[in-house]
Amino acid sequence: MADLSVEFSGLRLKNPIIVASAEPSNSVENIRKCIDHGAGAVITKTIGDIPGMRKLTENSKYAILNDKGTLIRGKVPRSFVFYSRSGYVTEPEQDWISYLKETQAYAAAKGSHIIGNITSGTVAGWRGLARMVEDCGIPMLEVNYQCPHPAELAAGAEGVWLAQDPKVTAEVTRQIVDAVGIPVMVKLTPESNRITEIAKAALDAGAASVAVNSRFVGFAVDIDKAEPYIGGPAGVGGPWVKYITQRWVNEIFDRFGCDISGSNGIFDARDAIEFIMSGAKVMQVGSVLMLKGVEWLPKVIEGIDRFLDEHGYPDLAAIHGLASKRALKTPAEMLSMEPLYCEIDRSKCKYPTCDICVRMCFYDSLHFGEDRVVTTPDTCIGCELCYNVCPFDAIRMLPKSERAETLAAE
């Protein structure tokens, strides 16, 4: 059995799976369930001082879509689209003082942790909520910057989400970090083309880690009704988005080597492992728990353990950042990849019943012959598209250098 424990922002977690700030963590009872099912930590649903955002939660709406863009109707696909609109916890922030104390005591007894997720509309509010959470014995904060920026913080910044502007991100983060003694994690938003710059601003201002990322804002359409699902724009995420999220995890890890919590795109253990190899130390799961239940947590955790054992890895550190470290960084490195060409295994090829490889080749390297598919290695650029689409594993990719050596020998 592999060691799944991980050191993250000063906390020792028994495993890297954290329940994200969402409905599964919106009450004492739900948080207890997450802990009972093995979560390394649970992030509370956002505690905030903006009444309108609490009201929004009371009017939450969801549309869970499949690859056709229609409602899943109980059949949860591997790559669902989670389209929803919600807000903060429904209770006033002061009510959560007792909830936080109770859940932290319960978590500690089970070897888990509570992370308090907060947001505010003022500097004083951010600092006050941060202190409130710390005073309850909570060991870590996650700050949710996906809300309008208050006018008092920076002239001309009204209406700007905090995590879209590096200077504003640094300003607010510094205020929060200075107010407490516990580590602060900043949750980034994908609604920015400056995510790496925003991450640096947060880290330079004292953040212990970053969470990559919160959800996009999308617009989903029900074409049969000629109207948007759930009335209009809403948050959109799900497993389909993991490759975009992992792009930023990789980039931030490569640039700064900081502690990263991967979020938005995790369905199962495979996804979690991809995030770890991209550079995340821990992962946040949320939408899948809302569709599969918190009973899904042990499946993810056990799946990670099984993968490590099967591949001979002793612990998470052995795979942390592996893919990121092996990634090509520059166009020059990408152009230096060894040229390949395709070769067809006649014993496996089903031509003329199947001709998909020829139809998919746009470089005139595959042609129809009288009784077989004919390859033209000299024009093959080694893109591997034919290798991907062949349903019979009849195509293999070989180095052009080996072919040149063979021809020379002949």
What residue spans do the PLM features occupy?
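Ferredoxin-like iron-sulfur electron-transfer modules
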Residues: A332-T353, D364-G382, R396-E410
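Alpha/beta enzyme core
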Residues: R32-H37, A41, A109-K110, G121-S261, ...
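N-terminal capping/small domains of soluble enzymes
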Residues: M1-I114, T119-A124, A409
